[in-house]
Amino acid sequence: PGPLAGTGKRNSIWNADEVEESPVVKQCASHFLNQFGLVTPELQHQIRYITAAAFHCIGCDSDSDRKQAVTPVLVQEALQNVQKAYAAHPDTHVEALALQAFYDIVHCPAVSTRHLVAVDALKVMPYLSREHYKILAVLLLFLYSRNAHNVDKETFCQYIDTYVLPFVDGFPTERPYYQQLDYLHCTAFEGKETHFAEILADSYPLLFRYRG
């Protein structure tokens, strides 16, 4: 499980202001910000915040731990991608996804699929809008959730109300969003047509393939 697993909310990343004042956090934040000519106070605060949060989520609570954590170049690159993703879209859902990906890069074996997916995810996140995330959320829900509790109409309706409807409001239908996701290798167009009923049957066989 990752840093946010099972909490239902964001972790509180500091008990006192000195976390944001850490010399290592300041150095990593400044290194990122120095790439840009115009930096607002708001952006400075956002980058210091997400930098401190990134170290906290991988279990680094002292500067010696932080220095050791960013020794590998790959981790430094991942941290910069976390900063870039959050700077582009300083939203709670982007924060949660970026921190989970950073955690996976640091703690999962380099040869694991989870590690490699996290590396690629952080690279494309700065280019994803809220609409892109809505599309991906619904795709992942229906293709991979395979919720074993959906055994009748009542439980499925509860599932839809809880997990699907929050994404439906303003759901993007414009083709460019889907083309962009394909270009960024977040999705891939299939050569054959797959009916929605088939996806539901594969994901929730107890409900949509029941023959009792």
Residue ranges of each PLM-predicted region?
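Eukaryotic partner-binding/assembly regions in large regulatory complexes
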Residues: 15-123
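Non-catalytic, well-ordered alpha-helical scaffold segments
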Residues: 92, 96-99, 115, 119-122, ...
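Short amphipathic alpha-helical interaction segments
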Residues: 92, 165-212
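Short acidic/histidine-centered micro-motifs embedded in hydrophobic/aromatic stretches
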Residues: 100-101, 139, 184
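Short amphipathic alpha-helical interface segments
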Residues: 123-166
